[in-house]
Amino acid sequence: MSMEKPPLASGLARTRSEQLYETVAADIRSPHGSMDANGVPATAPAAVGGGGTLSRKSSRRLMGMSPGRSSGAGTHIRKSRSAQLKLELEEVSSGAALSRASSASLGLSFSFTGFAMPPEEISDSKPFSDDEMIPEDIEAGKKKPKFQAEPTLPIFLKFRDVTYKVVIKKLTSSVEKEILTGISGSVNPGEVLALMGPSGSGKTTLLSLLAGRISQSSTGGSVTYNDKPYSKYLKSKIGFVTQDDVLFPHLTVKETLTYAARLRLPKTLTREQKKQRALDVIQELGLERCQDTMIGGAFVRGVSGGERKRVSIGNEIIINPSLLLLDEPTSGLDSTTALRTILMLHDIAEAGKTVITTIHQPSSRLFHRFDKLILLGRGSLLYFGKSSEALDYFSSIGCSPLIAMNPAEFLLDLANGNINDISVPSELDDRVQVGNSGRETQTGKPSPAAVHEYLVEAYETRVAEQEKKKLLDPVPLDEEAKAKSTRLKRQWGTCWWEQYCILFCRGLKERRHEYFSWLRVTQVLSTAVILGLLWWQSDIRTPMGLQDQAGLLFFIAVFWGFFPVFTAIFAFPQERAMLNKERAADMYRLSAYFLARTTSDLPLDFILPSLFLLVVYFMTGLRISPYPFFLSMLTVFLCIIAAQGLGLAIGAILMDLKKATTLASVTVMTFMLAGGFFVKKVPVFISWIRYLSFNYHTYKLLLKVQYQDFAVSINGMRIDNGLTEVAALVVMIFGYRLLAYLSLRQMKIVT
């Protein structure tokens, strides 16, 4: 029995099909067609209503299929007509749009866009679908080639009965909490595995554990890479993209990826080849238009969130990893950008890589892009298998959505124990009724705890054993390939000296904006001018003038002892996340980083003090002679480097800005009071503090430089040869830095 269509809709669809047929047929019969005054074909049907135009992507796909194009004036005319004529395929009231199949049934060769397509190509072509997109530049809309894979070690990852526990220390006792319980699964090269679950379900913990970034002392079960345990060699084969985009805000996109390439790519590649790899990754990720834009941060404008995420991914795929792990790569992105990010991961997987990603709440389009799925709930495994079979599995145990909903939302509701819009399995309902508990009073449905217990038990009894048996199958690799996974030797991308040079240059570029900010320059120069005005051409021929000038020298010692300390304490705490990330990836040796970090500040640190002394020295009437001027500047430089060392040590020991600032304030205040200007006679039992004060030694050296020809003792301070003070400052310079380095060595890598 056939159903009758509404007469209006039927007639409308037939009329428009006939109009389209007549338009195209007339256009084919006449190379130039019948044109109106504006150059538009007279037979073209007018755009009616709110119909949709042929999409840009659809047009590109059609043009890509054309076997050839006309040339000459005819081509120009047809292209002009094509630009002016937008064929609108209006959806009729029945909701059915004119499909490509119906166009193919016309049996015609399309020419209104300036190219010919035989009927057989039309009939063989696929329907228009936005799901066929490949990663493209979001702004420019240009297709990008797939990730150009190079030969790499394939990694077959298996994990069986994985557990993870942490000890929570309280005031009087400690409690052991289980984060993961009996997680099993596998993922092979060419596959994308998604880890799904509500917040706090253990997704990030499992991801870090699979990446080898969690100490094995607190884990249980087995994790194998090509049937071999984790080794340090694998660090150079694993890419790990953190949830937060840990990037330097003042570096451009190109600089960020270039430095990553120079540090991480093997020594066999030249500097130019590494630079070219960075440019290739920029092109692969569609970042050409923003490659010279700063990354940006909380206080610096930069690239967009989607571009920043792609830079983070580029930092990892630049090494051509065998295993790529990503923590929430779509977090904070719009649906289109998120889809393109997942499609990019598919391209990487298709090149023979193993890809694992956590995902919080994907759209339905994203969900169907994953090959495998792990669903976690309260640290337990609720499902592992093909993502396309997840709904069938839960339907088989009696859990089906009662309303139309996103599959991912359905699974997350189950993982949370929320079954308000989900059918209640009869077995679960009977169990709750028999126990007279585990039921919510308001809805009358089983409680989240009862739902969770049922789902865990259902998976363990129906699926778990079968999946565990599959893990026993050997991986399809020869023994030589397997043996590569067990090498214990690390593979540094470059030698120690090159690591130092690269990190030194990176540090200069990143912090050049901080040192020459208008606020800092204004602060230093305004202080210098005020000092110059207060001590304008002071006269040391009188005792009062000599004492006043000694006060100026003490202020210089205090100012350039105080200023560097509170700048340096921020160094390591602010870069802790970056240091954790790069050390976990074995990008460089800690010693190379530490030396580069502490020396890259020095060239910039000497510019402002030099300007300060040039203003103060000549305005206040200090000894006008090259010898005392340069000795005074050298003394201030020694004070700055020693004070920096103290700030670095405090910051590295505490790694907390609030605590470090408090401790630095107390320490600097103590050193200032013990500096020999305020208190002339210090009690013996506490007099040793002055010898730890860089203010004290700097003050004595400045007095010697200025007044060694005038007096033996000034303001209660005896002037000697100054070697003791120089030696004390040098010991502080190296001693404080050694303490800071040892503190960093003891710092655990937090993932």
Swiss-Prot record:
Sequence ranges assigned to domain ABC transporter in this UniProt record: 157-403
* Keyword line: ATP-binding, Membrane, Nucleotide-binding, Transmembrane, Transmembrane helix, Transport
Where is it mainly found?
membrane
Q: How does it sit in the membrane?
A: Multi-pass membrane protein
GO terms assigned for molecular function: ABC-type transporter activity; ATP binding; ATP hydrolysis activity
InterPro entries associated with the record: AAA+_ATPase, ABC2_TM, ABC_transporter-like_ATP-bd, ABC_transporter-like_CS, ABCG_dom, ABCG_transporters, P-loop_NTPase
Against Pfam families, the record matches this protein to: ABC2_membrane, ABC2_membrane_7, ABC_tran
For this protein, the parts annotated as crossing the membrane are: 516-536, 552-572, 602-622, 634-654, 666-686, 722-742
Question: In terms of domain of life, where is this protein from?
Answer: Eukaryota
Q: Name one GO cellular component term.
A: membrane
Q: Specify where the region named Disordered lies, as residue ranges.
A: 26-81
**Transmembrane is among the record's keywords:** yes
Q: Where in the cell is it found?
A: Membrane
Biological-process GO terms, alphabetical: response to water deprivation; transpiration
* Ranges for domain ABC transmembrane type-2: 498-707
Show the SMART domains listed in the entry: AAA
Q: Could you tell me which SUPFAM superfamilies the record lists for this protein?
A: P-loop containing nucleoside triphosphate hydrolases (SSF52540)
- Residues that hold ATP according to the record: G197, P198, S199, G200, S201, G202, K203, T204
Entry similarity comment: Belongs to the ABC transporter superfamily. ABCG family. Eye pigment precursor importer (TC 3.A.1.204) subfamily.
Q: What protein am I looking at?
A: ABC transporter G family member 22
Annotated source species: Arabidopsis thaliana (Mouse-ear cress)
